[in-house]
């Protein structure tokens, strides 16, 4: 009997969760983006269950975890250079965010490197329908990547994950989170997007000087 050699998975974060940050609201006692943080936790748990990702590596990276006082731009560039799949949470705030546009462009540069090397297989982008959106409300480039799935619950497309969670449809929302984790893991294996030198993004970050207060205030 031949020896079985298990196939090792890439030991990098599977998802970079790109989202339009909500501002603090004096009318609410809940932290902004609390539902998104919960979704990220559920998605991370499923990705750990579906893969052999080692402890100590974030399954899904969220920029809320950048330590206060750190060189946050360097942290963000490093994550954008290493995470395997971009996971944009589609919403009006994401579409109007300069930082989310930068995060998309960083992943596109990594993909272009693989195109130039002749090793590009497919996009390493898995959008999440976060807010309830009509197709005509989703602008390019987000509209150019598949964001709906025939085998997902029909109410996902009608309400988005935000609507499902807000209406107490937790069983449906958690099922969608599991299916999205499956999709992200599959895309990571298929795309095999290679890490790059974070310096590839220096000019993009330099162009954002003076914009830190928009969303990134670490």
Briefly describe each language-model feature range.
Residues 1-48, 72, 79, 120-218:
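C-terminal interaction surface of TIR/SEFIR-family domains
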Residues 2-7, 61-116, 174:
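TIR-domain catalytic/interaction hotspot
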